[in-house]
Amino acid sequence: MKLIVGLGNPGQNYQFTLHNIGFMMIDYLLNTIITDKKIVKKHNSYIYKANVGSNLVLFVKPQTYMNSSGHAVKKILNEYKIILNDLLVLSDDIYLPEGNYKLKLKGGHGGHNGLRNIIDCLQTKKFKRLKIGVSQDHNISLEDYLLTPIDDKKKLMVQKSFPIISNIIKNFIQDC
């Protein structure tokens, strides 16, 4: 069983913000590679259970706020007895240009508070994360940049890598 967690903040106000790119990627996956899924609301999360090929996969959107995502991730890992090697976290990254991505097998939080909380709750940095570039606008505060809804043009720009990222995620799912 694989666990793919998209980081974001719950609620309409945050739906199309750069900080919610993890949620957007989960939605993209659910709409493109998943044909049959079951949704469960548990552990302050939306958990979408789906078969991808011969693998059972949990696609998760924690409904805690970003900075408390680790609590939900830990509970789900424990309940479903998923090992850390089968966890992939999707997050935004201001240090990568829009449309770029980086797969890391382990490492620090890079200043990302959602990743920091997961590391703190799991007490390890040894889990995979796929960082999706959102760039940074130094003319406004980081909080405003990440939490202000984006227009359609910007959304297309940051989502241009989603098909390639989807293939990386499919490879992760199929890796036994």
UniProtKB/Swiss-Prot annotation:
Its main location: cytoplasm. One of its GO terms (cellular component) is cytoplasm. Its EC number is 3.1.1.29. It is an enzyme of class 3 (hydrolase). It is found in: Cytoplasm. The active site is at residue 19. TRNA binds at residues 14, 65, 67, 113. The record marks 9 as: Discriminates between blocked and unblocked aminoacyl-tRNA. GO terms for biological process: protein quality control for misfolded or incompletely synthesized proteins; rescue of stalled ribosome. The keyword Repressor does not apply. InterPro entries: Pept_tRNA_hydro, Pept_tRNA_hydro_CS, Pept_tRNA_hydro_sf. Keywords: Cytoplasm, Hydrolase, RNA-binding, tRNA-binding. GO terms for molecular function: peptidyl-tRNA hydrolase activity; tRNA binding. The record marks 92 as: Stabilizes the basic form of H active site to accept a proton. It holds the Pfam family Pept_tRNA_hydro. It catalyses: an N-acyl-L-alpha-aminoacyl-tRNA + H2O = an N-acyl-L-amino acid + a tRNA + H(+). Signal peptide: none annotated. Hydrolyzes ribosome-free peptidyl-tRNAs (with 1 or more amino acids incorporated), which drop off the ribosome during protein synthesis, or as a result of ribosome stalling. Belongs to the PTH family. Monomer. This is Peptidyl-tRNA hydrolase. It comes from Phytoplasma mali (strain AT). The gene is pth.
